[in-house]
Amino acid sequence: MSNPVSINNSGSISNSNLNNESLSPSRLSSSPNSKSMELNGKRTLKSSVVKTLLNRSSSGNNLNNTVTTRRAAGSFTSNYQNIYTPNNNSYNSSNNNNNNNNDDDTVSVDGDNPPDSPKSTKDHSNSVGSNSGGGGGGSSGGLNMSMNNIKQQQQDNLIKQQQKDRSLWTVRSLKEHAEVLDIMERLKPVNRAISFGQIYAREETQFDFDPLIGRDTMLQLILQHLQFEGLMDSRKLLEEEARVQYPEYAINESRLVTLLRTALKDSERVFQLTLDDKKRDSQQQLEEHLAFLGLFKDETATDIMGEDVNIYDEPENSNIIYVDDKEKEKEKEKEKEKEKDKFGPNSTNSLSGSGSSPNIPSGMNNNSSSIGNNSIGNSNSYSNGELSPLSASTLLMMSPQNKNSIETNKPQVKAASLNKLVILLTPDNNHDLEYTKTFLLTYQSFTTPEMLLEKLVQRYHVPQKPGQSLDDWKKSAVPIQLRVANVIRTWIKDYFSDFNDKLIQNVKSLYENMKQSGNMSHAKILSESLNAKIKGMVGMDDQKRAPTFTSPAPEPKVPKNIWSQTLDIFSVDEEEIARQLTLMDFEIFSAIKSTELLNQSWNKPKLRHRSPNVLTLINRFNEISQWTATSILSYPKVKDRARIMAKFIKIAEYCMRHLNNFNTSMAILSGLNASSVHRLKFTKEELPKHTQQVYTELQFHLSSAQAYKEYRALLAKANPPCLPYLGVYLTDLTFFEEGNPDFIQGFINFGKRKLIYGSISNVQSFQNAKYNLQPVYQITKLLKGFKLLEENDLYSRSMSFEPRNKERSEIL
């Protein structure tokens, strides 16, 4: 066993064994000429300590003092404090009992406290006196056991870490932490975690069959839909396979489609969950910003003033705002000035006759009216100044109906509570038909069908005032009750799609109540109108709407090769193509319901299902525009392109001049003004002079300048039948919706609803007059089956046919 060397406070060596005196740290540090030796000694001592730890940690031989081991961050460290044991020799520094002298008494390999032995460590090595008494062997044996245990524990921990199951860690962690799962599903509902719905869904009840709509009911709905669509063979085949019998019902609609529309209407907010994250986040930020500014309007909110107040508890002379006379006079003067400026005698030119050329503004010849860039689908893109709409009052004054209403001396309602609007809807005298039409068309923008029926029921039950005789009460109540019954009848007749099963039952309860009260005439009004709709009976008014013509339709201009498979657009006369296009487009236009034009449904993804026919006409417009450009760019030679371009110009001219079909004319002009066609300079120069003049006139009269001023003037002069350009109405409706508040001083802005009704009623007036034309199946099929090229392909062809900086002689 080696003899320890003890170093006292004065730095002298107390042991007589000086064989390794030259290696003593105290000697190295005390010698004035030993700086280089000190550095070498530090490196040697430090490396020796590390080697000793690695080579001898398992045996513990020649380690006479306690080794302090620590475990940090998954590893252990052996701290040798004041100990050095190379070559069976140990240098031990004594540890004084006085803690204040510890810093001076401790011998450090580095001349300071070693990194592995901080000053705060309380586990110092023992002094020479305590270790020299033959206890070294026991200490070494204890150290061996301690080191082996630590090593074994470290190996066990390493094995456990390696064997830990890391598969599906996300799923398992979310199961263990439900709050994290809840937050994730709230932030990203597109994950569609079913558990989120299960947490907040109502308690499930197990049924052997569906209590709401079972298999038989579903089959009956499908069979009724097939019956309604005229698919009799499919219906019979389904009956045989399903072994069910379909009792024929006289229902003038598909109940399956009606139920699906109702479901879509009830679940419109669900659409937001299907939006992509970026779009949804931007929409949420916009709504939060608008809410902060106090401008956000929840489309599902129906908290309208007066909904929770009985209609007869409403104060008589309050909660209504009228348009004052001064405001009306000022508005009239402004409109007269605008009429002089915009619709003067020299502002428009007659389209009859092609000899006189219109006064075309400078620059109009070479610049299209940007119709190609402002397609019908983007009708609200007027922020650039080109499509700045006319004022609301100007647009209303263009309609003869609204002109008459403005010129009357009746007080005009500007805003009112819901109760007041219902009272005006059902007056005891002086019934206003235009007000009824406006209200029933637009009421869903400020209340619900259920609330409206509830208010009408309240209005029907006229209370008897204190001291009022029965005869006097009847004189005042009967006219109001009759008006309520007539309003409900009109509502059912014109807007039966507003009624779901619950609402129909409420109407039935109302006329049962009328019967019990002895008002048989009122009950008959409701029962007949409701039964007529349910059973699909056609009323007298619907029969009057059937087209009747006093003269026969003109003879179609059928080409000789009408039955040939080589039939193409060049084989058919331009006039007949214009007729068939008009019939096809007017069929879509006449199918548009007034409700499809409300709330900008065509422009909002989650409401698009409300406007199927509007979207169909928009798509049809864009198809004709694309077809025009594709047809022109299908020919590589200039003369061929000029020939097909001239044909389309003639078709557009005939549609506008002779058929008053402005929608199809605008679609063709949009294709001619597409960037891929508009740049074809040599093709346009190849057109005949007369065709170039017609093209210029088309651009002028259908220009979007000054909110389509020239087009509006043509439309005002046009005699029915007429197919207007739908994009203008969509622009106006967007302007009315976004440019006017829904409420004024907390009351419903009914003036805004009048503007909307005025525009929609104009559309309805054009739907009533049908075209007396004969369809030709072969030509219609040809016009439906054209091929379309994408915008990029069209522009690539345009650049290859007429490259930039090329002369006419270099072009085919």
Curated annotation (Swiss-Prot):
Start and end residues of each stretch annotated as Disordered: 1-146, 320-382
Biased composition (Gly residues): 131-141
Pfam families, alphabetized: RasGEF (PF00617), RasGEF_N (PF00618)
A GO CC term attached to the entry: plasma membrane
Residue intervals of the LisH domain: 214-246
Compositional bias per record (Polar residues), positions renumbered to this chain: 75-86
UniProt-listed SUPFAM superfamilies: Ras GEF
N-terminal Ras-GEF domain segment(s): 409-535
Amino acid composition bias (Low complexity), ranges on this chain: 1-36, 53-65, 87-101, 344-382
CDD domains: RasGEF, REM
Keyword annotations of the record: Guanine-nucleotide releasing factor
Source superkingdom: Eukaryota
Molecular function GO labels: guanyl-nucleotide exchange factor activity
InterPro entries assigned: LisH (IPR006594), Ras-like_GEF (IPR008937), Ras-like_Gua-exchang_fac_N (IPR000651), Ras_GEF_dom_sf (IPR023578), RASGEF_cat_dom (IPR001895), RASGEF_cat_dom_sf (IPR036964)
One record GO biological process: Ras protein signal transduction
Ras-GEF domain segment(s): 573-804
Basic and acidic residues bias spans: 323-343
Role: Promotes the exchange of Ras-bound GDP by GTP.
UniProt-recorded name of the protein: Ras guanine nucleotide exchange factor J
Organism name: Dictyostelium discoideum
